[in-house]
């Protein structure tokens, strides 16, 4: 995927100005406010050991999950990184004309919104952005006291053959590989550096009298699948299998199956057609290696949180910005309206409240914003559109049983076990439909949308989708 890191990598921005929408309130450690460690993991799908994928080696995430509330049905609002992050961090829904793709910016698409880090900053928190939080490093820059990103080529290759081929730092078109197995230490790749920066921040923040909102944006398992050799060695290629859903049913609209251009851009990937089985398995192997690599880096930060004595007063939120296809429906990457792209990991640890519980309640990423505000006693801005899931953390039932996600023309309503998608034009008129019942078809292989016996249900879901996608969904943003 193309990157828009238009500022020099490694840029450190220290800013003190803030939006004048709200009066700043000072909070000090004397009042014992809760800190927040906010961990974003790029392209992490919920194929993890604590989600039941026993073949994945993720001991540090497993430990965090055992101390947290684990959300089994958490959905991103947009399955592409820039838009998903901008939506989550502003707490606002995507519309027909907002949060469209990876280039989306919070400060451009939702300039009226008070972002999550800005809310914490305005209430006296030290706010730090490390690594990839927003897609664009300078997005919403006034919300942070410090913005840091590691220096170097964004593809971060270590093998000379890949470095030479990757002539353009921002384009996979340089011809380099979609994966790399290099015998290097963890700090050779960006996530090792990001972890070290987070550890240093925690050691410094321990001495501060101010509470903190520390955001850690880890880069893997995003393409290219580059990880130190020892993490590749955790998995036996011979034991890796293609997904059960390695098929594209004819009943499903062709619109649902894009050509996954993000992966096709790499030099060792065919430009069209199905991938050869051995290449598909090598990609899956690389993804798994990256998951284990980033797990180890996150573990270092969580260990530092404990060692500094901050863990008992720090909320930890870990989320993947969307799902990812590893050959599911013969698809790769995100950018689609299937469960595999819309469902993403969400784990929330609240000291004294969570201890390995699990929830099957449906949540959306925009629900994270109001929840963190309520947990820390901050007022939720009027611009935030999500619903707090604090009742779930408190052991209560959640009334909400739906989520809405969107990618370009495709808009999906998840309601209980039903998974309904429409592709619409600018007037909101559907031109393709897709309906799955996860109770009987969790693999999404039998599209019910065009079957006569389901037409009444389709009408009901179409109406409900329009009620829930937001009143401004079709409005052109003229700002």
From Swiss-Prot:
A single GO cellular-component term on record: cytoplasm
Family recorded in the similarity comment: Belongs to the sulfatase family.
Biological role stated in the UniProt entry: Sulfatase involved in ulvan degradation. Ulvan is the main polysaccharide component of the Ulvales (green seaweed) cell wall. It is composed of disaccharide building blocks comprising 3-sulfated rhamnose (Rha3S) linked to D-glucuronic acid (GlcA), L-iduronic acid (IduA), or D-xylose (Xyl).
Lipidation (N-palmitoyl cysteine): 18
Keyword Manganese: no
Protein's name in the database: Ulvan-active sulfatase
Post-translational modification: The conversion to 3-oxoalanine (also known as C-formylglycine, FGly), of a serine or cysteine residue in prokaryotes and of a cysteine residue in eukaryotes, is critical for catalytic activity. This post-translational modification is severely defective in multiple sulfatase deficiency (MSD).
Lipid attachment points (S-diacylglycerol cysteine): 18
Alphabetized UniProt keyword annotations: Calcium, Cell membrane, Hydrolase, Lipoprotein, Membrane, Metal-binding, Palmitate, Signal
Taxonomic source organism: Formosa agariphila (strain DSM 15362 / KCTC 12365 / LMG 23005 / KMM 3901 / M-2Alg 35-1)
Binding site for Ca(2+): 42-43, 81, 321-322
CDD domains xrefs: iduronate-2-sulfatase
Enzyme Commission (EC) number: 3.1.6.-
């Amino acid at each position: 995927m193309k990157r828009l890191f238009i500022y020099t990598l490694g840029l450190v921005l220290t800013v003190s100005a803030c939006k004048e929408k709200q009066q700043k309130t000072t909070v000090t450690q004397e009042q014992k406010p809760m800190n927040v460690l906010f961990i974003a993991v790029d392209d992490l799908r919920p194929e993890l050991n604590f989600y039941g994928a026993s073949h994945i080696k993720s001991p540090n995430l497993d430990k965090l999950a055992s101390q947290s509330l684990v959300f089994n049905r958490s959905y991103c609002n947009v399955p592409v990184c820039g838009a998903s992050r901008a939506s989550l961090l502003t707490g606002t829904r995507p519309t027909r004309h907002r949060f469209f793709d990876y280039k989306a910016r919070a400060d451009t698409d939702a300039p009226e919104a008070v972002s999550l880090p800005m809310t914490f900053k305005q209430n006296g928190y030290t706010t730090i952005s490390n690594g990839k939080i927003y897609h664009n490093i300078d997005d919403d820059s006034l919300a942070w006291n410090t913005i840091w990103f590691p220096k170097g080529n964004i593809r971060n290759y270590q093998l000379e053959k890949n470095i030479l081929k990757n002539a353009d730092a921002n384009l996979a078109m340089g011809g380099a590989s979609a994966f790399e197995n290099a015998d290097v230490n963890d700090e050779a790749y960006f996530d090792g550096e990001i972890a070290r920066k987070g550890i240093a921040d925690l050691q410094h923040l321990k001495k501060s009298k101010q509470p903190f909102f520390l955001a850690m944006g880890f880069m893997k398992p995003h393409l290219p699948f580059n990880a130190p050799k020892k993490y590749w060695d955790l998995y036996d290629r011979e034991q890796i299998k293609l997904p059960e859903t390695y098929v594209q049913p004819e009943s499903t609209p062709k619109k649902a199956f894009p050509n996954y251009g993000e992966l096709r851009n790499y030099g060792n990937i065919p430009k069209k057609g199905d991938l050869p089985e051995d290449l598909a398995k090598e990609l899956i192997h690389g993804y798994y290696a990256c998951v284990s690599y980033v797990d180890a880096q996150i573990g270092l930060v969580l260990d530092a949180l404990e060692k500094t004595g901050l863990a008992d007063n720090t909320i930890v939120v870990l989320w993947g910005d969307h799902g990812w296809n590893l050959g599911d429906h013969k698809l790769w990457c995100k950018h689609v309206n299937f469960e595999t792209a819309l469902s993403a990991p969400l784990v929330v640890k609240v000291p004294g409240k969570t201890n390995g519980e699990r929830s099957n309640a449906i949540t959306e990423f925009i629900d994270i914003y109001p929840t963190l505000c309520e947990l820390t006693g901050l007022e939720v801005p009027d611009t935030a559109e999500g619903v707090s899931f604090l009742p779930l953390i408190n052991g209560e039932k959640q009334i909400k049983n739906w989520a809405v996600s969107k990618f370009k023309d495709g808009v999906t309503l998840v309601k209980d076990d039903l998974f309904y998608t429409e592709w619409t034009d600018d007037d909101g008129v559907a031109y393709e439909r897709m309906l799955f019942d996860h109770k009987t078809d969790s693999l999404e292989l039998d599209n019910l949308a065009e079957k006569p016996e389901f037409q009444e249900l389709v009408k009901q879901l179409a109406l409900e989708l329009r009620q829930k996608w937001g009143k401004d969904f079709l409005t052109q943003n003229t700002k």
